[in-house]
A protein has these predicted regions:
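A domain-start/cap signature at the N-terminus of enzymes
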Residues: 1-75, 151, 155-163
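N-terminal-biased segments
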Residues: 39-56, 114-128, 132
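Active-site-proximal beta-strand/loop segments in catalytic clefts of secreted hydrolases
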Residues: 66, 79-83, 109-112, 151-155, ...
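Gly/Ser-rich "nucleophile elbow"/oxyanion-hole loop immediately N-terminal to the catalytic nucleophile
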Residues: 68-72, 117-154, 170
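Loop/turn elements at helix/coil->beta-strand transitions in domains of secreted/extracellular proteins
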Residues: 72-76, 101-107, 144-148, 167-173
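Active-site machinery of serine-nucleophile hydrolases
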Residues: 74-76, 82-131
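Structured segments of extracytoplasmic/periplasmic soluble domains
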Residues: 101, 131-138, 163-166, 177
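Primarily recognizes the serine-hydrolase "nucleophile elbow" in alpha/beta-hydrolase
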Residues: 146-183
Length: 183
């Protein structure tokens, strides 16, 4: 069953596509052997660059998995300000130590060159949805469904707010520090 969810911003109605969470994963992945001394240790840790394709446009994002990430832990979707690469944000924002301290995975989205596109919010929602689906697919790690968090900074707050409103049943909490007035 396909469900469409809508958000009305300034009289423009935007939809979020099919919320089917099953992905057709085509990436070959080699999993290391489980550690019998520490079977809960994550297979993958550190930074993993990922890519999604929306309407033939490829966009990147980063996963950061802490060294002691639990079997099913929290995930924080971060929307930095305009024109900040996910790598720069991860290295300079102070979020890596927070992730290691709290054992929360970080999913760092990136604006396109020129910044987050408020005029075409649907393309940003589609990007966010693709990142969300790929992140929760349990390929590299497993997030607990009750602990998806969303944070937006600067102009990234606008996109984070729009996406979180469309997915209020999925996002446990949202924090915004920037321009997020959707009117």
């Amino acid at each position: 069953m396909k469900r469409e969810y809508c958000l009305d911003i300034d009289g423009n109605v935007y939809t979020i596509g099919d919320l089917n969470m099953f992905l057709d994963n085509k990436e070959p992945i080699s999993y290391p052997a489980a550690n019998p001394q520490d079977p809960a240790k994550p297979f993958f840790t550190g930074i993993i660059r990922q890519e999604v394709e929306i309407d033939s446009v490829k966009r990147s994002f980063l996963l950061y998995i802490p060294q002691h990430y639990p079997i099913s832990g929290a995930g924080i979707f971060l929307y930095p300000d305009d024109d900040i690469s996910a790598e720069d944000y991860l290295e300079n924002s102070g979020w890596k130590p927070v992730a290691e301290q709290t054992n929360a995975a970080l999913i760092v989205l990136e604006s396109r060159s020129g910044g987050w596109n408020k005029k075409d919010i649907q393309s940003e929602i589609s990007y966010s949805e693709a990142v969300f689906k790929k992140s929760i697919a349990r390929v590299y790690f497993s997030m607990n469904e009750a602990t998806y968090y969303c944070m937006g900074f600067g102009n990234g707050a606008y996109v984070a707010a729009a996406y979180a409103m469309l997915n209020s049943a999925l996002i446990a909490a949202v924090a915004l520090d920037g321009d997020y007035d959707l009117h």
